[in-house]
Amino acid sequence: MGARGMILDRLGRELRDLRISITDRCNFRCAFCMPEGQDYEFFRREEILSFEEITKFVKAIIPLGIKKVRLTGGEPLLRRDLERLIKMLSELPMEDLSLTTNGFLLKEKAKALKHAGLKRITVSLPSLRDEVFSKLVGREVKVSHILEGIEEALRVGLKLVKVNVCVVRGLNHEEIVDIAKFFKGMGVIVGR
């Protein structure tokens, strides 16, 4: 703890951002994210924090200097009634509430998320090519489906849409410039 009651990292810097994994479930099996093998043991439902517990925790930690909260997973859009959690958190005094997703369910959920109070969204998009994308995420997926979700997020007015590209040498490392060019002028930030 810092002198002003702030949470400090190992280098003595004030922590202002909080990432909360609201589920360990995911509809993808990304090589760069999920544990290998079929024997991965997910948390039991009763081991996952309830929306009320998450909100209580965030409310308690805001006075310690937290300004931004990012919801992650697994895939947070798989969490049932996620919009209710977004609404609960958006009513707390913080600067930013965002979510990181693989984008597969975004087209269907963007409007409700925005309406509930979500401000920003980050979509993991490792490739614009279906075959490379599918190989990296461990299931057959049309990239166009993810792009439609990003377009919907922009259409409903999410203020900041970011695309993260996990670069894997030999698979998608040559695509980063193409991905940046693809989103240029669309109001989407591309990062890695």
Give short role names for the model-derived ranges:
Residues F28, F32, F42-F43, F51, ...:
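Phenylalanine-focused residue identity feature
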Residues A3, I7-R10, L18, Y40-E41, ...:
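Short, functionally important structural connectors and interaction interfaces within domains
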Residues D9, D17, D24, D39, ...:
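Acidic-enriched, low-complexity/disordered segments with a strong bias for Aspartate over Glutamate
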Residues R10-L49:
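Canonical Radical SAM [4Fe-4S] cluster-binding loop centered on the CxxxCxxC motif
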Residues G2-D17, V177-K181, G185-G187, G191-R192:
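Auxiliary Fe-S-binding modules of radical SAM enzymes
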Residues E75:
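Conserved G/P- and acidic residue-centered "switch" motifs that form tight phosphate/ATP-binding loops
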